[in-house]
Amino acid sequence: MGTVMGSDMRPNLLFIITDDHSPEVLGSCEADTPMPMPGFRRLAQEGMVFDRSYCANSLCGPSRACMLTGRHSHNNGFLYNYGGPAFDGSQPTYPKMLQAAGYQTGIVGKWHLISQPTGFHSWQVFPSQGDYWNPTFQQLGPQGRTVHHQDRGYVTDLVTTKAIDWMENRDKSKPFALIVGHKAPHRNWIPAPRHLKAVKEYVSKLTPPDTLMDDYANRPEFLRHNRQSVLWDMCNWNDNHLMQKMIPFDVMKEIVPKWALRGMVDRGVFKDNGGVPADFNWDAHKPKFPAKNNFGWGLDFMDPGTREVYEDFFNTRTKEFVEAFRAGKVQTERDMAVLRWRWYMEDYLGTLLSVDQSISTLLDYLDRHGLSENTLVIYVGDQGFYLGEHGLYDKRWIFEQSFRMPLVMRWKGRIAPGVRSQAMVQNIDYAPTILEIAGANTPENVNTMEGVSLTPLFRTGEAPAFTDRPLYYAFYEQPGEHNAPRHDGFRTRRYTFAHIWTPTQEERRSGVRRPENEWLLIDNEKDPKQMHNVATDPAYAEVMNQMKEIYHQLRSRYRVPENCPGNGPRIPDFKPSW
């Protein structure tokens, strides 16, 4: 086969993908963290951690499309999660190429590309995001039809069990390639019951990010219009899991918008919880900390006994909040932001504890069956995620917390263990890497891809071609749920550069773009927390010229259409190229 291994002993592939996993949490690979994760730690100690690993489009579905195809979003056609065309399953992907090379291929868990999976001998995937409890799976049925079935249990455990079953029942005469797609730690975060109390204790030892109350000065104006604020955009119910029925009127009136409060009064929410003061002045009232989102919350798919466990836990959370509020401990916006951040961390990190157990279970299975020496294990998140840095949750931006993603690779005897690589790598690189180690890296296959194989990094974690490689990024989903602008750009070892295509409302009215809103340049060496846009700083004029030249070179190399990602109400029409 190719350059890595003889054709008589082709390696297996176990590709584990989580959803919205911040690489900052890979710090839990270290033994002295407040929240130890032995599965992640073992994987890091036995494999290589890539500290400068980036996505190409920080959204769940598009990132997965980039991994499958080895191509950027505009060249695989899947630009955003919803509202556009489904992933075109007829295009070249590495699972199809592995199939053709004699591999048995499968996927369990999250797919999130709308279309029916292709390139797999078997699949059991969520119809969309999946639910934390009793999720629905779909698989191929008679006459090529998709059939659905609901499984009972916690989603991470179910996906892990399906992965083990798939490996148990595979054709043992063939090498295998299995994708394990976990829902966790995607919103809305519901840890397994066994982790609720432990994670609360862990989070009590954590300190909020020092940028939690960022005012977004000195950066493009769109950051101030972003709708992913921990303080203002997290829902009290669906995200923070407060129990509405336990919050009395004197507290509730400060944490929801006035329109939502009126609706609660009309529905009699406070009837058995102190009622509403007869002299309450609706006209004069202005809530202190009104969450903009007030949709329902996700305990709907649980069995009654399971729901009771969560209700007991979240009842306690709500009771403690009401007591703190009435005791005057929630006076400022920072006070409220820290509380919402702490609830967020309890739930987000709690979901990762089950993923950690899944990793241990899967690695133990490989050990027991003599597969560890000849199986490449890849662990990735589909992108990064804000954990309160700059006051945000979610992703979408070219800023570091969103753009950078976890990547760990383990292949015993082939990949140096315990190394933290500083190479500049991207998720479009996984497909060509997998093809090379499988001996399927024919010119016909590799020529469809824009990524490069990472095998030169396997020995030491470093190679000249990866030292300061510029990594292209593009985000298309505008208008969208969180109001992030369309933008594209790239990251080098030192600089983050972007062209923000979407004008602000004022710029759209005037027809004039302000340079500080249109262009972004961050000097990550001098400004590692990315607090200052120096695009218009005269001291960086020459750097800006260099960055714009690299930007246009990258757009040319990757055949980005001239008007893409565009600045109008719709994405420009263009034909993906592969």
PLM-predicted stretches and their roles:
Residues M1-W519, P528-E549, Q553-S556, E562-W578:
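Formylglycine-dependent sulfatase
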Residues E525:
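Residues forming the ATP-binding cleft of Hanks-type serine/threonine protein kinase domains
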